[in-house]
Amino acid sequence: MKSNTQNAKIEAITEKTLVLGIDVGSETHYARAFDYRGIEYSKKPFKFSNTEAGFVTFKEWILDLKEKHEKDKVVPGMEPTGHYWFNLGKFLQDNEMKPVLVNPHHVKKSKELDDNNPTKNDRKDPKVIAGLVREGRYMIPYLPDGVYADLRTASNIRFQLQAELTRIQNRISRWFNIYFPEYKTVYGRPDAKSGMLILKQAPLPEDILTLGIDGVNQIWRDAKMRAVGKARAKTLIEAAEHSVGSKEGAISARMEIRMLLEDYESRNIRLQEVMTLIAELVNQIPMAEKLLEIKGVGIKTVSGFLAEVGDISRFNNPKELQKLAGLALVENSSGNHKGRTTISRRGRKRLRYLLFEVAMSLVAKNPEFRELHTYYTTRRLNPLKKMQSLMAVAAKLIRVFYVMLTKGVDYDPKKMVGDIKRPAVYLQAA
């Protein structure tokens, strides 16, 4: 994040810089080359494939242009098109040509400047991208490596599995609403272990009635479950007797719930495996285990934070982290009009959501952060609304994490409470 201002970015493009605009595709990429003033060196877009041979050919083309036009630096720019740019970006970085990214929205808005035409094609887009790079309208991507690369991948897998589990749970809930709505009066959670044991053998009310109280109880005894017995079995039987669930399509209904339960259990096993790996990776990062000592902060928060942020040493201060999360304060003012100050919501959305969730956890479980939240919402000067205060608590946690990770200090509850009395703490918040 160092030297990340627009002036610094513009100054990085000198007379000796070869600027590349690359239109990234799933299988084929197109590139055009320019100098720092926008004069093109490539007669036509250079086409190369998303393969090792294609990358080598692209590198040879770049080196030929560098030598021919006496350039000593290459700045390749591209749009972050899904995941398609990852391999090309890593190849360029490994060959000492650090890629930069331009905002796709900026590309879309800028492509009419030259010809007043919104046409999108493989020749036009690389030129627009290169133009944005020359103007310093780019961002320097962070490509994690080592333990941070593993942690980000594992964290992404965790989020995907949790999303799949949520979808499966919703489908199971739908199944109950259709075939056995009374089940939810017996079990508050559809995934209760004793309930799932019964569902595997007797999913429909008529199946449960066939088993009877003794049959239901025997299933639990065979599974060595002691927390449930005939009293719970009787409640389940009574619910089945008075069920208003649909009796049509019973054969398919049994198959559907069996498949859903199998999917649910398999995803849970995978999630546990991923969480084991995540815990091992977090332990490899210096001071990361200290973050877990903060009451209300768990392994999911720490791993998610480190996966999104990566190496903390690349940031100069906590404000850069705040900006990355989209929690930077932005003001909407003009002339005598002074608008509301809000958060930017520009940055890594998953990091922002994670911080918001942990802020709610901290306010509920951590005395120091609860006191901070109370101060924000009840102070005499400029009290914050609850949602605004949670954003301020999230920003405070960023500062705490940053100091602990960069300076190697332990969490200090007394200092945390002492910070509340500082007048500079969020006079205005999102």
Label every PLM stretch briefly:
Residues 1-430:
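A detector of single, family-specific signature residues
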